[in-house]
């Protein structure tokens, strides 16, 4: 039985989220958005990462926004979000003195360090301008390459506004 739909918004181009959300709801399965390439992209006027039950964003060194490595997980279910917070740091809640810890789950070390977080936070002030430049460059290439014989630009869904993390074309 299918447990989840995992959709990748490749190169910053949003997938057809209306259809995927419909299928997930119809069959009672989870929709997970891989937004690693799509920070700043929108679908039907809404930000990528807001359609799924879960969304994953990458802040790896060459993405729109970087923390050198790392990323962020978002989810709709507050109960699962609390559990995810515990699992990210050895099964322990952050900020609780060790003498008062009640470790009920085995965890991992998936938390971001403070230096990486500061690197990311320092970019938030200008992230919209950076993404806007990627979009302007993508549209420029779309317009120029569309007139070159032998090349085909990526078709963009009417509801999609890509963030053009990388540029793709067909030959």
What is each of the regions a protein language model found here?
Residues 1-67, 72-74, 78-79:
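Active-site phosphate-binding strand-loop segment of PLP-dependent enzymes
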Residues 4-8, 13-19, 26, 42, ...:
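PLP-dependent aminotransferase class I/II
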């Amino acid at each position: 039985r299918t447990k989840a739909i995992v959709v990748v918004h490749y190169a910053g181009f949003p997938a057809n989220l209306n259809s995927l959300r419909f299928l997930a709801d119809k069959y009672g399965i989870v929709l997970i958005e891989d937004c690693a390439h799509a920070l700043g992209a929108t679908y039907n006027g809404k930000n990528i990462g807001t359609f799924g039950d879960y969304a994953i964003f990458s802040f790896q060194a060459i993405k729109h926004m970087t923390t050198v490595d790392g990323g962020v997980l978002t989810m709709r279910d507050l109960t699962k979000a609390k559990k995810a917070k515990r699992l990210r740091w050895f099964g322990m809640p952050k900020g609780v003195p060790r003498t008062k810890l009640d470790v009920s789950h085995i965890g991992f070390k998936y938390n971001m360090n403070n230096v990486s977080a500061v690197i990311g936070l320092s970019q938030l002030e200008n992230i919209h301008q950076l993404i806007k430049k990627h979009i302007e460059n993508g549209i420029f290439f779309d317009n120029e390459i569309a007139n070159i014989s032998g090349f085909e630009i990526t078709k963009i869904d009417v509801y999609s506004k890509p963030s053009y993390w990388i540029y793709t074309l067909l030959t």
